[in-house]
């Protein structure tokens, strides 16, 4: 199992392309923010796959970008698969699950903070 902090740190480093300043303020729709969010999301799906399958069965019209499914089952470097997913889709899939507030939101905030990324509203 890949640790959440490892995924978030790796995603942020790849997205930034070089070492960034100690703190960076970015728009919530910035692709670097989206990649950190998606890294946390993929890690959460891997850790709680049965919950996601149950949610999908109960909500068959909820669709996910195919890149997310590919990333979940590809245990190598998946970050390049997740680039280019529109910010509105990222927000929709991440906030659309019942455990967003209790599990995903705190993990995303922690990962962004650990990477020195702070967000501002669009």
Curated annotation (Swiss-Prot):
Top-rank lineage group of the source organism: Eukaryota
One term under GO cellular component: fungal-type cell wall
Biological process according to GO: fungal-type cell wall organization
Location relative to the cell: Membrane
Chain segments annotated as transmembrane: 7-24
GO molecular function terms attached to this record: structural constituent of cell wall
Keyword Cytoplasm carried by entry: no
Pfam families, sorted: SRP1_TIP1 (PF00660)
Membrane topology: Single-pass membrane protein
Keyword annotations: Membrane, Transmembrane, Transmembrane helix
Family per record: Belongs to the SRP1/TIP1 family. Seripauperin subfamily.
Name of the protein: Seripauperin-5
């Amino acid at each position: 199992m890949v640790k959440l902090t490892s995924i978030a740190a790796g995603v942020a480093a790849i997205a930034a392309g070089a070492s960034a300043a100690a703190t960076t303020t970015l728009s919530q729709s910035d692709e670097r923010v989206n990649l950190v969010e998606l890294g946390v999301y993929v890690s959460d799906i891997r850790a709680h796959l049965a919950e996601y399958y149950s949610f999908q069965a109960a909500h068959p019209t909820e669709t996910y970008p195919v890149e997310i499914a590919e990333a979940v089952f590809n245990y190598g470097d998946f970050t390049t698969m997740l680039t280019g997913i529109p910010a509105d889709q990222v927000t929709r899939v991440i906030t659309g699950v019942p455990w967003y507030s209790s599990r995903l939101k705190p993990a995303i905030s922690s990962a962004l903070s650990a990477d020195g990324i702070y967000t501002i509203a669009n």
